[in-house]
Amino acid sequence: MHLRIDTIEHTLTAAGLGPGPTGYLVAYALAEDNLRLGHSIVADSVNSLAITRQAWRDTAIRAGAVILEVELECSDVDEHRRRVEARTPDWPGQRLPAWAGVTGRVIEPWDRPPFRVDTAGRTTAECANLVVQRWPAAACWLPRHPAEHRT
């Protein structure tokens, strides 16, 4: 299941609720419900804050699921800028970040290393394939039951 924070936040805004933590809280609840049903979840978000990363981990732990934390990065600054500036809205009125907003965003440090994928020179399919190849290994580094988890 693909959970895209942009879509959830857009829907909440259209319903008269402004942006804020509500979109993430809805995503955590949907993720936990679906993880408990045995579904895999792809949580699509910027996830620049340590508190949101921990909330995703906690969601997986409560559901007894494994988690693979993935960070996408583009090491080619020119390519990254081209992608940001060429992006088109997915719905009318969608406000996309400008390059200055992307480069000015504060990314809090990770407290444990994610699986990093450098998207420079790669297609979306190639990047997705790298994640899929890594997924089976995730079960080796996160327990399936909350009682086994140590932070």
What annotation goes with each model-predicted range?
Residues 86-130, 136-151:
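Small-molecule kinase domains that catalyze NTP-dependent phosphoryl transfer to phosphate-bearing small molecules
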Residues 23, 52, 80, 123-127, ...:
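Hydrophobic alpha-helical packing elements
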Residues 7-9, 48, 73-79, 121-124:
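Conserved nucleotide-binding/hydrolysis micro-motifs of P-loop NTPases
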